[in-house]
Amino acid sequence: VSISSEHDYSEESSQYQWLENDLVNANQDREAHPWLITMFHRPMYSSTESGHGSEIDFRDAIEPLLVEQNVDIVIAGHDHNYERTFPVNSETVYQTDTNTFLKPEAPIHLLVGTGGRFLYPGSSSNPEWSAHFESTTHGYGILELLDKDSIQFTFYDDDNGDVLDIFTIGRINVVTPEHTPVPSSDG
């Protein structure tokens, strides 16, 4: 599910109402829609210092709805690096396991802005909600439904195919990721 982070996203806006309605309907039958994933251009969470950073107004307006409707993953771009959060709501972290999350209480946010343009350097602040950050290599991600109760995201180095980050979310139990993540060169 996606709306524009570039246009009116206030609660009164038509796109907010559409998003709310779509998420409510999907939540009524999680058997048919086991995973709720949203996508926006601008990130709610970004620790880059030289890019645009977190879109606080957008986060304040939209994040409560995403948490209320049990959204699992939020995907964004805009800043030219890769970053993954822990499950987070209003900068409060809910689980800090680096790769496996069982029934998280808040969405995991992915910033995947590594498609080919110049990359933004990382932040020296390393916020508590940031689980993994990459700013030295272009890359891409694959989101894989392992089964109706497990979903896995893997971020790959575009040059050599190395796994740079991987995590799994489970509803009943957590399937162990098949790959071992390569430590980030950013620490």
Predicted regions and their residues:
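Short, solvent-exposed mixed-charge patches
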Residues: D186-G187
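Metal-dependent phosphoester/phosphodiester hydrolase catalytic core
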Residues: V1-S123, S130-T137, I142-P181
